[in-house]
Amino acid sequence: MFKNQYDTDTTTWSPTGRLFQVEYANEAVNNGSAAVGVKGADYVVLTALKRNPVSGLSSYQEKAFKLDEHVGMAISGLVADGRALSRFLRTECMNYRYMHDSDAPLVMLADIVGAKHQRHIQFAGKRPFGVGLLIAGYDRQGPRLYQTVPSGDVFDFKATAMGLRSQAARTYLERHFRGFPACDLDELVMHALRALGAATSGGVELNIKNTTIAIVGKGTPFTILTEEEARKYLDGFKTRPEDIPAVADNEEDDDELHEQPPDVEE
């Protein structure tokens, strides 16, 4: 992408009906390290690949955030923007609990953060958030998995992935998602890790240092596994050749991974 006269702010449309600032923000998400979400009958699992530290003296940046006991999120894109949105959503959860003495409905949280994304592309003087979110939780409707993007769109998924080389992960999910409702928690975690492994570059193996695993579900609050807890899944983990699509860069139709849109009554 190159600078042109239509990309100076988010309120300037190109003659072809494009908002270049929003497209640039989407590129920040697409170039972020990969994150995967997988939903079963009773659980949702998030896995995310942390960026390599700049030097041996720095640590990996966190990619998953707990928002409330029943909900959390993983991010791809600008980590600072992700932290800002995590603080915003934590505040929304606390306000709802104070007013209603119950957990905030997940569809409401997804709509709220989608509206916040959209406000930042509707007015001059603001920039889009350069981050995408995978929001995972469990409420009265059961396990839920939502994805938000810089344009403000909100999607309800059975399984999805975002970030660099995420098409390879989505291809893996498309092949296996029909069996997810019958999986127990350990099997769901392994599916999420295999999908994440498919999105890694050559020579990179998932380990307890560069991989985040988070779980939430029936009777299980949102939990980001510690390194020792993650060791159960990652010690000896290897990406299998059959988990990597032959052509990872071909965009495929992933409509089957979608649930109903959040604004459609069930």
From Swiss-Prot:
InterPro entries: Ntn_hydrolases_N (IPR029055), Proteasome_alpha (IPR050115), Proteasome_alpha-type (IPR023332), Proteasome_alpha1 (IPR035144), Proteasome_asu_N (IPR000426), Proteasome_sua/b (IPR001353). Keywords: Cytoplasm, Nucleus, Proteasome. Gene3D superfamilies: Glutamine Phosphoribosylpyrophosphate, subunit 1, domain 1. Coiled coil: none annotated. PROSITE patterns: PROTEASOME_ALPHA_1, PROTEASOME_ALPHA_2. Residues 235-266 are annotated as: Disordered. GO terms for cellular component: cytoplasm; nucleus; proteasome core complex, alpha-subunit complex. SMART domains: Proteasome_A_N (SM00948). Pfam families: Proteasome (PF00227), Proteasome_A_N (PF10584). GO terms for biological process: ubiquitin-dependent protein catabolic process. SUPFAM superfamilies: N-terminal nucleophile aminohydrolases (Ntn hydrolases). Residues 249-266 have a biased composition (Acidic residues). It is found in: Cytoplasm; Nucleus. Belongs to the peptidase T1A family. The 26S proteasome consists of a 20S proteasome core and two 19S regulatory subunits. The 20S proteasome core is composed of 28 subunits that are arranged in four stacked rings, resulting in a barrel-shaped structure. The two end rings are each formed by seven alpha subunits, and the two central rings are each formed by seven beta subunits. The catalytic chamber with the active sites is on the inside of the barrel. The proteasome is a multicatalytic proteinase complex which is characterized by its ability to cleave peptides with Arg, Phe, Tyr, Leu, and Glu adjacent to the leaving group at neutral or slightly basic pH. The proteasome has an ATP-dependent proteolytic activity. This is Proteasome subunit alpha type-1. It comes from Trypanosoma brucei rhodesiense.
